[in-house]
Regions:
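Enriched for short, Lys/Arg-rich terminal
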Residues: 1, 69-109
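Arg/Lys-rich, positively charged N-terminal/basic patches that mediate binding to nucleic acids
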Residues: 1-36, 40, 109
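Generic hydrophobic/packing signal
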Residues: 14, 23-25, 29, 49-52, ...
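A generic structural signal for ordered secondary structure
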Residues: 19, 30-34, 48, 82-87
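Generic structural signal for secondary-structure transition and capping sites
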Residues: 20, 27, 42, 46-50, ...
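Short, hydrophobic secondary-structure boundary micro-motifs
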Residues: 31-32, 52-56, 100-101
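Basic/aromatic recognition patch in beta-strand/loop cores that engages polyanionic ligands
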Residues: 46-86
Length: 109
């Protein structure tokens, strides 16, 4: 079954912030990082349930899963939920950030 993937406005803003941060330091790396991230997001079109539940999944009424992207010091957690045949990317957080609290996440309606 193929899933549609939608990136929420909050996740889009977080991706943009990370891209700009990397671009200010190394434009080539930023472009490579962004292309890799988009390719990783695209993998959620097939078998998104292969990804583990997020550490914080019990805080939320819906199942929240995570997909890790990157290596070394550039690992990001893509937090998402699945509704029917749509995968919603909720947040994109650096792996070094503290775990989520319930008030950090608004699920799309």
């Amino acid at each position: 079954m193929a899933f549609q993937v939608e990136v929420t406005p909050l996740a889009e803003a977080q991706i943009e912030d990370a891209y700009v941060w990397y671009r200010d330091r190394d434009a080539d790396f930023a472009d490579q990082w962004f292309r890799g991230l988009m390719n990783t997001i695209a993998t959620l079109q097939e078998s998104p349930r292969r990804c583990s539940l997020a550490v914080e999944h019990e805080l939320f009424a819906e199942e929240v899963r995570q997909l890790l992207y990157g290596t070394g010091r550039t690992i990001f957690r893509l937090l998402f939920t699945i509704r029917g045949d749509v995968v919603y990317i909720l947040l994109v957080r650096h792996a070094s950030q503290a775990p989520l609290k319930a008030e950090d996440l608004e699920l799309p309606e």
